[in-house]
């Protein structure tokens, strides 16, 4: 079902609020239109994953997340991944592979997040991370622990890590060492 009418209800340099009329006489459905962005699983030459710690005004605290940023007009997700990696961490990658994209929130957002894996990442001489960003490195077990304990908890970036794992780009343990606990039977809501 396509909207009968779509109007920009509010606009900023970073996003637009859209009002979509779905049926005559009904109140509009509101959603956000944002640019796509790329998140980078950057693996250093010594097999550590880069992360950044930065203050996020939306949640009013520092967060730990993957290097990421908007895909600029005319830029590919791989180019955005390389640029953001360099800007946020001061690292350059030997290779960047785009694994695909996901829709961050199909009920509210009209954009995509691109999963990129950068390998052979090394610090570029003379480059420093953006002001206010602390660069962190994790081994895969350390990153798994940080995720399990809620230290690394950007939901979309956890999803990006999962995509990298299921595509075989990150291996936490040999496949035969991973076990899945039996699930409890589903409970019916009454």
Which residues does each PLM region occupy?
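Unchanged
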Residues: 27, 36-39, 44, 69-156, ...
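Acidic, metal-coordinating catalytic segment for phosphate/diphosphate chemistry
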Residues: 4-41, 45
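A glycine-rich, hydrophobic loop/mini-helix early in the fold
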Residues: 37-68
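Short helix-capping/linker segments at secondary-structure and domain boundaries
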Residues: 164-177
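Extreme N-terminal tail/first-helix region
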Residues: 1-11, 180-186
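Acidic pyrophosphate-coordinating catalytic loop
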Residues: 8-13, 30-31, 57, 102-113
